[in-house]
Amino acid sequence: MNFLNESQTLWRDTVHQFVEQEITREYIRKCDTERAYPYEGYAKIARAGWLKLLIPESAGGDGGDIFDYALMCEGTGKFGFDFATAVMVSTFTAMNIVHHGSKEQQEQFLVPFMEGKSRFSISISEPQAGSDAANTKTRATLENGQWVIRGQKLWCSGAAADNVVIAMLVRTGEGKSKHEGLSVLLIPNNTPGVTIRRLPTLARRATGTTEIFLDEARVPESAVLGKPGQGWSIITEHLELERIAVAAAYVGNAQTAVDDALRYAHDRIQFDRAIYEFQVLRHMLADMQTQVDAARLLVYRAASLAAASTPCTREVAMAKLFASETLQTVSRQGMQILGGHGMLPEADMERYFREGMQSTIGGGTSQIQRTIIAKSMKI
């Protein structure tokens, strides 16, 4: 793989500087503490033009590649993965609309998204359909030119925010396997019959994780993305982008966890010297930085392969697996280094730790990633 060229280095530095100065760790901490969606931060990202980074120029976007996007996600995840989630989850559906949406859908949804006036959420999981996502029970039937939807969805990120269109996986028919007969419907979150409840989760407190109840909710027949029955291929097509993006954001958050722990180790005086002078702390910090650097390289490799349209299912799974477990590990070690101070919200480490705990679950569990890797090894 090639390491960053001059323009990529400039772009990465620009994102990090923007997040430090315009978003700030204090703002992200406040959103987390108050369980408040980061509307102001999201709007700043939109005004900077970054929401249209991946959108093709033909659709009014910048036509950037997935490597550029990974660098952006690394930066937006700097002070917490949750903020990056607000940006990423919208982009995943936007790209599905780019690839599969009708001309009318692209005109209706993409321009407001790029301007930051609307956002997207993805709804796949259900109470009995997590990793086994094709076991979808939520059903949509076509009645008098409308899809009538009944069921329940779970673990939907950002669905309760204002002006959200939900890309929802539903069952519209039957087939030889459970992967057939699935469709994706674009459902505004203020649709009558749609009830959304924020869940009091350990992590992702700002963007919000929700459950959705659908009681004969109705949307036009034209709300289907692509064609009926194409849902499984559409919803899984974005997984490569999603896993590279979240892995990059994990790396950004993990690096800050190391930086914060290192700064504390310099400032904290015990037994008449800074605690970093104790070898046990130096070794902990050395291991933490090594893990983050290794995770970053795996992410950059996966992103560079994807940008070159090279098959990289295995490399993407490795990046997601290692980056998520790295965030979990270094945030836990950061908590140990900060001691009692780490338990306080203003230290931020406890937020990184909470995000680290969900990182090995969301976007495909570590066990699923290992299964993908093992399959690529023919074992």
Predicted features along the sequence, with ranges:
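Short Ser/Thr-interspersed hydrophobic loop/turn segments at strand-loop and sheet-helix junctions
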Residues: 49, 72-77, 170, 187-192, ...
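Alpha-helical interface subdomain recognition
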Residues: 1-79, 83, 100-105, 112-117, ...
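Flexible, small-/acidic-enriched active-site or ligand-binding loops
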Residues: 135, 190-218
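A short, charged helix-loop
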Residues: 210-237
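Helix-loop "lid/cap" segments that line or gate small-molecule binding pockets
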Residues: 91-100
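A short core secondary-structure module
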Residues: 146, 150-195
